[in-house]
């Protein structure tokens, strides 16, 4: 008997796939998807042609009823992103002083057709 996955999981996977394709169109190489540590996750880790690692949180909202996709990125989520990025650098790269940055990629509307925005995370 086939099992069905909740719509949110399908939407999340579709949003992350579209985000990865967009980052690749910018010349980046996707080096990791869904990097998890206890209490945190980075949706996409990519490398720019110049070598900078970019840690991307993907957020998608089909409807604005509960706020925008960007509104769903809380200070707590940003702190967890920082922690996960530092863990990635030390564990996967062996050092924490590599050029890197955090960003949020939002999709407003359906995952495959909604408006896409890429925003740098300050700090």
Curated annotation (Swiss-Prot):
The protein's name: UPF0102 protein DR_2282
Record NCBIfam families: PRK12497.1-3, YraN family protein
Domain of life of the source: Bacteria
Pfam families per record: UPF0102
Family in the record: Belongs to the UPF0102 family.
Taxon lineage: Bacteria, Thermotogati, Deinococcota, Deinococci, Deinococcales
GO MF term set: nucleic acid binding
Gene3D superfamilies linked to this entry: 3.40.1350.10
